């Protein structure tokens, strides 16, 4: 479980990640965000069918749920990494056939994760991640 903050811009971070990380980091970010929602809005998370709590006490997971701005940074990073994943891998194998890559499978919860920002604590001090 990691979040590589190598820039302040989520799009720049995604572009700089190596191929191995771009393939797995979308899922890791999804796990952190899903955990944040499960902690702050368990009923919403259950209705949306979000992933179960994972790595609840990991520093990156704690950071994501501390406030709505941190949470939205994670949402933007997840989207940027997925966009980069699709750009690098426009085709993928499914059932033995090459098909158009429409995104990482963990993106199926993305809209619910965006909507869940309203359940995150609203504090005025964004804890800027430092590269």
Can you say where each PLM-predicted feature lies in the sequence?
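Short active-site loop/helix that positions an aromatic residue
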Residues: 63-68
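Secondary-structure capping and boundary motifs in well-ordered enzyme cores
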Residues: 52-53, 70-73
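Phosphate/adenylate-binding glycine loop and adjacent helical scaffold
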Residues: 1-49, 59, 96
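Catalytic cores of phosphodiester-bond-cleaving enzymes
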Residues: 36, 74-131
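Histidine-centered catalytic micro-motifs
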Residues: 54-62
């Amino acid at each position: 479980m990691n979040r590589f903050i190598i820039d302040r811009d989520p799009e720049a971070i995604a572009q700089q990640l190596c191929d191995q990380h771009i393939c797995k980091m979308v899922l890791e970010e999804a796990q952190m965000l899903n955990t944040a929602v499960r902690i702050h809005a368990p009923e919403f998370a259950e209705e949306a069918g979000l992933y179960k709590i994972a790595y609840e006490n990991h520093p990156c997971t704690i950071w994501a749920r501390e406030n709505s701005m941190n949470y939205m940074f994670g949402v933007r990073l997840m989207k940027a990494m997925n966009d980069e994943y699709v750009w690098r891998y426009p085709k993928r194998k499914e059932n033995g056939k090459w098909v158009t890559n429409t995104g990482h499978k963990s993106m199926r919860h993305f809209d619910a994760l965006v909507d869940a920002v309203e359940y995150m604590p609203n504090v005025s001090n964004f804890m800027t991640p430092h590269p």
